[in-house]
């Protein structure tokens, strides 16, 4: 990400050296939109507003589930959402499930999930995917969700800024603000963006052909510098 590149440029080791950012690639043949209703039925998810949150360990402090829970609590307390009209879908492992007791809306924890087909089904079932991490070097979950037509909401502090174009294909909340994260969730629920538009924001920036071309251009520029 450009955020990581900026950190590299400011380091003692890389200071004064050229740093180029080339993003991760996403296989668009593996992450594809699925039918929402069918996906929800298959996963046992009710037909309400669905928010997805996933991580290798959902209880890891750095992943910021506490911010999402606080955002949902804010929405319920201010009556901007009704607790029985929202379902939080969690996927990933956990060493402790104590934090789940604080979730103020209905939720379903799917546990560890593997395979692009299963992940695509989760993203397709959701209306919003939230990444409330303290930082992300890139944000792979966000581009996976976009490719499946799900609107991402995240903080504006790190690698997510490369992926989410604020209020165009998602929402970037003020870092550490559960209230602004809540605003992002409401915005995503009330401003549906077409599946094709969301997916296209990945196709044009993270498809194999686009990223491969960036590598080719970088190699060519390095070779050109060596011959001059």
Language-model regions, residue ranges each:
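Short alpha-helical donor nucleotide-sugar binding micro-motif in glycosyltransferases
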Residues: 121-126
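Aromatic "clamp/platform" in nucleotide-sugar-dependent glycosyltransferases that forms part
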Residues: 134
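Short hydrophobic beta-strand element within catalytic cores of glycosyltransferases
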Residues: 151-154
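A short, well-ordered alpha-helix in the C-terminal region of glycosyltransferases
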Residues: 180, 193-208, 214-217, 221
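A short, active-site helix/loop in glycosyltransferases that binds the activated sugar's phosphate group
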Residues: 1-21, 26-30, 34
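Conserved donor-binding/catalytic core segment of Leloir-type glycosyltransferases
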Residues: 45-63, 69-73
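Nucleotide-activated donor-binding/catalytic signature segment of Leloir-type glycosyltransferases, i.e.
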Residues: 81-85, 92-117
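Conserved acidic donor-binding segment of nucleotide-sugar-dependent glycosyltransferases
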Residues: 166-167, 171-178, 186-192
């Amino acid at each position: 990400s450009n955020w990581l590149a900026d950190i590299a440029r400011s380091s003692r080791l890389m200071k004064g050296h050229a740093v180029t950012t080339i993003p991760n690639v996403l296989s668009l043949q593996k992450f594809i939109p699925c039918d929402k209703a069918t996906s929800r039925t298959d996963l046992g998810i009710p037909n309400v507003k669905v928010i997805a949150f996933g991580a290798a360990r959902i209880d890891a402090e750095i992943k910021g589930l506490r911010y999402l829970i606080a955002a949902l609590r804010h929405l319920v307390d201010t009556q901007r959402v009704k607790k029985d009209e929202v379902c939080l879908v969690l996927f990933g492992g956990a060493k402790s499930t104590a934090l789940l007791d604080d979730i103020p809306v209905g939720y379903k924890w799917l546990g560890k999930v593997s395979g692009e087909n299963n992940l695509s089904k989760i993203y397709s079932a959701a209306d919003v995917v939230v990444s409330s991490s303290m930082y992300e070097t890139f944000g792979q979950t966000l581009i996976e969700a976009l490719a499946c037509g799900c609107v991402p909401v995240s903080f504006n502090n790190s690698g997510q800024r490369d992926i989410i174009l604020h209020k165009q294909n998602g929402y970037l909340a003020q870092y550490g603000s559960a209230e602004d994260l809540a605003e992002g969730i409401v915005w995503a629920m009330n401003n549906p963006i077409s599946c094709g538009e969301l997916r296209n924001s990945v196709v044009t920036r993270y498809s194999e052909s686009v990223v491969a071309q960036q590598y080719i251009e970088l190699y060519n520029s390095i070779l050109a510098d060596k011959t001059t």
